[in-house]
Amino acid sequence: MRSKVTGAKRWVVKIGSALLTADGKGLDRGAMAVWVEQMVALREAGVELVLVSSGAVAAGMSQLGWTARPSAMNELQAAASIGQMRLVQAWESSFGEHGKHTAQILLTHDDLSDRKRYLNARSTLRTLVDLGVVPVINENDTVVTDEIRFGDNDTLAALVANLVEADLLVILTDRDGMFDADPRNNPEAQLIYEARADDPSLDAVAGGTGGALGRGGMQTKLRAARLAARSGAHTIIIGGRIERVLDRLKAGERLGTLLSPERGMLAARKQWLAGHLQTRGTLVLDAGAVQALRQANKSLLPVGVKTVQGSFRRGEMVVCVGPDGLEVARGLANYSALEAQKIIGQSSDAIESLLGYSAEPELVHRDNLVLV
């Protein structure tokens, strides 16, 4: 199983705030230098590398003399805008000492939910990687709002793994990996060395929240692994305080928790659909429609929908749930919520008489639908 790590040719490495700062007192340049040494060694071993770096808010807080992470959005954005300058300068300086170039890329969810911008970001990232440059990626905290934020850099790293079709996502954290119980409360807790990313039993052991400086707890890391699995990537959740951890991973040492995709890589468009985090409404399906989606790879027809919830326009993302309320799929609606209300439960042949026109016979076409 660890051959999936040692043989991986393209890595996305996510480093959290706690591993880049000196107890919240600004950037730890010494720690960053050690990370860079290991990443340069990976590059020289032929590994293509993308870095997703937290730390902008923490660096800005230190510069402003703040000791506690603010909750107000405008204060967070102010800290991020100050800290991002210092963060990128630190990475550029450290990589430059080894003759390596870096590039800053700031992303928002809007960048990846728009198909044209998504493809442009993918093209830019792949070009940088092909040139041997190390892209340093962060969320654009200065302009993002609660409604369109990724929520944490674990999720962003997973979507970047999809963008560049990475073989491996490495999420470095302040824990040694995922445990079968909370090691802070249970001394008998055992590290989970390998599992399938979609294993439902992992949800029960992934509770908890992030640290004081960061946003992502173990649950977000598990969700990130599942997102990355959509593009066929393996994910390692591993302790960033383990000495020379990246070197040791590359050497095949059995460290951290390796989460593997069960299914093969989704097609590129399906990866883009799976990466949509913001949904506008919900379609409640009957059992027959659920079966048609899951077993026959069919489009979603109006006749199979029982209820429409929320407000959405044509082309916006909706969640499809079964009679039990569990999510089955998500996709882009061919009709608005108001139009969908009028045609659900009806044959596609009746759409024109009900609406006065017929855009498509499907409520969600299978090409715009991804199973979850």
Curated annotation (Swiss-Prot):
Residues reported to bind ATP: 14, 173-174
Family from the record: Belongs to the glutamate 5-kinase family.
A GO biological process held by the record: L-proline biosynthetic process
InterPro entries for the chain: AceGlu_kinase-like_sf, Asp/Glu/Uridylate_kinase, G5K_ProB, Glu/AcGlu_kinase, Glu_5kinase, Glu_5kinase/COase_Synthase, Glutamate_5-kinase_CS, PUA
Enzyme class: transferase
Primary location recorded for the protein, binned into one broad class: cytoplasm
Subcellular location: Cytoplasm
Protein name listed in UniProt: Glutamate 5-kinase
Enzyme Commission number, as recorded: 2.7.2.11
Reaction(s) catalysed by this chain's protein: L-glutamate + ATP = L-glutamyl 5-phosphate + ADP
Cross-referenced HAMAP family: ProB (MF_00456)
GO MF term list: ATP binding; glutamate 5-kinase activity; RNA binding
A cellular component term, taken from the record's GO annotations: cytosol
